[in-house]
Amino acid sequence: MDSDAAPSVTPGAVAFVLENASPDAATGVPVPEIVLQVVDLKPIGTRFTFLASDGKDKIKTMLLTQLAPEVRSGNIQNLGVIRVLDYTCNTIGEKQEKVLIITKLEVVFKALDSEIKCEAEKQEEKPAILLSPKEESVVLSKPTNAPPLPPVVLKPKQEVKSASQIVNEQRGNAAPAARLAMTRRVHPLISLNPYQGNWIIKVRVTSKGNLRTYKNARGEGCVFNVELTDVDGTQIQATMFNEAAKKFYPMFELGKVYYISKGSLRVANKQFKTVHNDYEMTLNENAVVEEAEGETFIPQIQYNFVKIDQLGPYVGGRELVDVIGVVQSVSPTLSVRRKIDNETIPKRDIVVADDSSKTVTISLWNDLATTTGQELLDMVDSAPIIAIKSLKVSDFQGLSLSTVGRSTIVVNPDLPEAEQLRAWYDSEGKGTSMASIGSDMGASRVGGARSMYSDRVFLSHITSDPNLGQDKPVFFSLNAYISLIKPDQTMWYRACKTCNKKVTEAIGSGYWCEGCQKNDAECSLRYIMVIKVSDPTGEAWLSLFNDQAERIVGCSADELDRIRKEEGDDSYLLKLKEATWVPHLFRVSVTQNEYMNEKRQRITVRSEAPVDHAAEAKYMLEEIAKLTGC
């Protein structure tokens, strides 16, 4: 452009945008030239927003993420002038505010000294909108006092092609997916709302759920969900029912890019939504879905990995977590009977580790157990790395993870975190002794490491508050003595040697495991017991799992059972007595359980350690210093 020319804006452009929220070039109607000034430019997250001014009116405007580099490079500046080549005017937020979303533009002038102000027009004059289709310029209207226009040189008639003719020619030479893209411009996900009609989106499938069946008062059916991500990283959940679910389930593949149109939107149910979007999409059997070949610029699955030693605070909560780790072991497929409908579903447990030197058990369900689980079993000797998105955290066996309907697993992903993990495992992790996070939860929480000296409380702090742990598990550290281990309690249970679940005596001989669906000649014993502990403020009963109980008693449940049977009750009682009146550090969780319609507080030991008197003295000196301000 001529740098000496005085830049101007298009009068009435804001009013035109408000009246024409989504112009469509495929209709053959020329797109008007819209020149606006950038006012009050500022960043919001990864995008930039400003007020677009036509000299008289202003409208709140947002640039897509793909245009953000233009701002950072200085091409687009405050008080600059831009020509809008493609846009959507949408209603956003609870206030139903009109927002201009610019998807394509060119810079007319980087920055002026001041804001452009147009004088008030006479009432009879209408704003001039200059329409500029390619290779032609037509003035639809002009002010009455405007100077005469220069002569217009028309090209030979045979060379003139309408916009619709050009589009039709391009369609004929294009591949199906490209043809769909040319039919209408692609809309960003952020611009969609339930009141829009025709739109096309280009998105990547970043999560794909299982095809599930349901039964309600209206009958039976099937449903599945996908999570879709566009070039700006905006996400939306799409749901398909019955015939649409059967049609699109095999069509949608995780990680691929698609053009989608003829769907509908509604306000998302906040209780069930899985992505940050005010709306959710429904696709029926009339929706159009076509794969887009060779599209790599749309973001892949976005992870928010949590280290294994930082999983503790997520126990029992609704928040799902993403985990990346090295596969250590893979169990055979088990058949589990679901209590709700008595249906048998496949399950497989895998154990993964990361560079926090902790391991965690992850339960794979349904197709993930039989497909990906089998793949992992076949390659477990090579210690593959897996990235899993959307895992539920529970307190089963201390702490464990399990997949849900929308969980996704990528084996040996091409991620920086995977490269770092592989380097760690090959150099030192392979020979490192690792502990299960389920048996040692004193390790961490989000925001920093937690130790046996973090969240230290007296027993009275827990026992004096009957509502503690009512909403979700809370975690504390204790320094207490074991005052009693009742010898007549149920100290252990018979467990399957494969999965550690409870077994029953089989008819004839052996032991039956419902989880493994098999009969074994032998079983093992695993501790499940309670102990009474005391500190200067009181006493309480703590529940123990096998790993912590073995360290406290000093032998396995099988060994203690042998002592009782072969050496008699005196040796058995002596073994338990030797474990009492010894100080221990405990990391515990506090929850509420209901028994006989009465809520009771349950304190469970998550990890245990002997008292390090030097470390304990240092901790006490630090606490004293905090109190005295020294």
UniProtKB/Swiss-Prot annotation:
Tissue expr: Expressed in root tips, roots, shoot apical meristem (SAM) and young leaves, and at lower levels in mature leaves, flag leaves and ears.
Organism encoding this protein: Oryza sativa subsp. japonica (Rice)
Subcellular location: Nucleus
Name of the molecule in the record: Replication protein A 70 kDa DNA-binding subunit B
Subunit structure: Heterotrimer of RPA1, RPA2 and RPA3 (canonical replication protein A complex). Interacts with RPA2A.
Gene Ontology biological-process entries: DNA replication; double-strand break repair via homologous recombination; meiotic cell cycle; nucleotide-excision repair; telomere maintenance via telomerase
Keywords recorded for this protein, A-Z: DNA damage, DNA recombination, DNA repair, DNA replication, DNA-binding, Metal-binding, Nucleus, Zinc, Zinc-finger
Inducing factors: Repressed by sucrose starvation.
Family indicated by similarity: Belongs to the replication factor A protein 1 family.
UniProt keyword Nucleotidyltransferase, yes or no: no
GO cellular component: DNA replication factor A complex
